Amino acid sequence: SAACEPEVVDLARFLNAMGAQITGAGSPTITITGVKELHGAEHEAIPDRIEAATFAIAAACSRGEVTLRGVRPDHLHAVLDKLQEAGVGLERRGGDLTVKAGRGLRPVDVTTQPYAGFPTDAQAQMMVLMTQARGISIITERIFESRFMHVSELARLGADITIEGPSAVVKGPSALSGAPVMASDLRASAALVIASLVARGRTLVKRIYHLDRGYEKIDEKLRRLGARIQRHSDA
């Protein structure tokens, strides 16, 4: 069956504006009728929902208040619902989303699912947040196998996480401390950066080329929000 993600719907809209004949985008069945040619068109791409989720979780982890502009909260229901369940304050105003960290984070269980369920691409970031919640959280990965490579690196920072089959059991809150860590993929690298914001002391995240595949100038954006973060050419 076809993926139902907003990005698929947005691409179909763009191609249709260029003269394509595509129906069913956003459903399990997409029908494409061939055309002789495509023509030019103007199209505004939708905002990156995973980048928005990453910054929202980072704000919650660092006990800050951040307003994300130009987001689509309707594309983030599963993530925002879990953040609210964890005690994170959210305020929606049009295309703006303000994230206000609560006084105490509550543990929540998360299971990754196809859209519109909780996205696997926000699983690692959410795990970092749960290391700061008081209690036990269970994060279950149902989309990809072996997508817990970040667990051992989070453990280097002091996280208490145990893998049990497709699930990771997170016990919190953990007082994270800086240490050298190594990113294994795109979202794991984002999770390690978030954990570094929480950790006391200096953390060096290696292999940040993973990070650049999915985030544009994330270090500069975090620095503008007050983070003490520097990029090293040999990282």
Positions of predicted regions on the chain:
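Short, structured segments at the rim of ligand-binding sites
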Residues: 1-235
